Design a protein with these regions (language model features):
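Conserved ATPase-coupling elements of RecA-like P-loop NTPase cores
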Residues: 1, 201, 227-230, 245
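Ser/Thr-glycine-rich phosphate-binding loops at phosphate-binding pockets of nucleotides
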Residues: 1, 212, 218-223
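Conserved interdomain linker/interface between the two RecA-like ATPase lobes of SF2 helicase motors
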Residues: 1-141, 191, 277-281
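Conserved segment of the helicase C-terminal RecA-like domain
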Residues: 24-25, 216, 222, 229-294
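Conserved C-terminal RecA-like helicase domain
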Residues: 69-97, 105, 111, 132-216, ...
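Active-site glycine-centered loops adjacent to acidic/histidine catalytic or metal-binding residues
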Residues: 131, 190, 226, 260
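Long, largely alpha-helical accessory region at the distal end of helicase-like NTP-driven motors
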Residues: 281-350
Length: 350
């Protein structure tokens, strides 16, 4: 508000926390989904959820483990077929104690997660995975499974839309892009969405999802930025992401932005945010992310050489300088200088 006042003049800030479609928060343990909060508790973490997690960590329950041992889950079948290798560990021999402790819990494969969501009437869903390779890997997991989320009529309708959307792309290019497998995935009701895809492919996925023909999308966080693709449910597999330098926790702002895709206005009465539990994940931490509504905004604006040259070419030096001085980054920098000056003055008077 203060920044806008300096740029535009007198500004009145109006704060609204009303959400057109209410959002329910959930955690998934094995094949079960538990409410994150106690009903009508004002934000108290679900005691039953905490008890289940404690039992799971102590090895007193087989939630998420029985299917893995018996070979029912998709990841279990992949492990048995692959000679003892799993997605999370190497060969069975020589593993550390920490790795053996994680055997108490095995996350469901992506197809199994979608089946659980389907049984709870939580589709369509967007699963956020913080890498392009992870999104493609999730898609191939579903392809290798027997999962189908569409009827025969819907599958044919999807194929017709896809074929019309790629008309004009040479056949040899489609072969390089693995078009047939991508088309099959769409016809079965699931897709990947990330910036590494051909723009035409991304637009087709967005169109089919908005039409309700594709029921599951595995996407990077770029889908939460400016693309109108709301879903009934948003799934977060992890609460950490790689920021280019290190793996860091999601901030409340990022969590709110991602889960903000849940709940379609005029269609759903409730949206769902589902976090998949993993060892060492504290439900109170998740509750903190879900309940935080105010968080600092920090500008990431950083002028570069190309921007400077373009501004000078279009506006000249004086006008370019005035424009940059109006930026939120400059406003925050000025504020920090004022605060540091006050600190120095207070220190001098001591």
């Amino acid at each position: 508000g203060d920044w806008l006042s300096t740029v535009r003049g007198d500004t009145t800030v109006i704060v609204s926390e009303h959400r057109p479609v209410p959002l329910d928060q959930w955690m998934m343990l094995g094949r079960k989904i538990y409410p994150l909060f106690e009903p009508e508790s004002g934000g108290q973490v679900n005691a039953e959820l905490e008890r289940r997690i404690q039992r799971l960590e102590a090895g007193e329950t087989d939630d998420g483990r029985a299917d893995y041992k018996s070979g029912k889950g998709f990841r279990a079948r992949a492990r048995h077929k692959g000679g003892g290798r799993s997605e999370f560990h190497g060969k069975g021999r020589g593993r550390s104690g920490a790795a053996r402790q994680q055997d108490r819990y095995r996350p469901l494969g992506r197809p199994e997660v979608l089946k659980v969501l389907q049984s709870q009437d939580m589709l369509p869903a967007i699963t956020f995975i913080f890498s392009r390779a992870g999104c493609d890997g999730a898609l191939y997991q579903c392809l290798r499974s027997r999962m189908v989320l569409t009827s025969q009529e819907e599958a044919q309708h999807i194929k017709d839309i896809v074929d019309a959307g790629v008309e004009g792309i040479p056949e040899e290019d489609l072969q390089v892009l693995d078009f047939k497998r991508w088309r099959e995935a769409l016809s079965r009701g699931f897709a990947a969405h990330h910036a590494g895809m051909l723009p035409a492919f991304r637009h087709i996925v967005e169109d089919l999802f908005v039409r309700g023909l594709v029921r599951a999308v595995f996407a990077t966080e770029t889908l939460a930025l400016g693309i109108n693709m709301p879903a009934r449910t948003v799934v977060l597999e992890k609460l950490i992401k790689f920021n280019g330098e290190a793996h860091v926790d999601l901030t409340p702002g990022q969590y709110t932005q991602l889960t903000g895709r849940a709940g379609r206005r005029g269609i759903d009465t409730l949206g769902n945010a589902v976090v998949q539990w993993a060892p060492a994940m504290d439900p109170r931490q998740v509750a903190g992310l879900a309940s935080t509504r105010t968080y600092p905004l920090i500008s990431t604006f950083a002028p570069g050489y190309n921007m400077a040259i373009n501004l000078l070419g279009m506006l000249g030096f004086e006008e370019s300088l005035r424009l940059l001085e109006k930026s939120f980054a400059q406003f925050q920098a000025d504020g920090s200088v004022v605060e540091e000056t006050r600190e120095i003055e207070r220190a001098e008077h001591r």
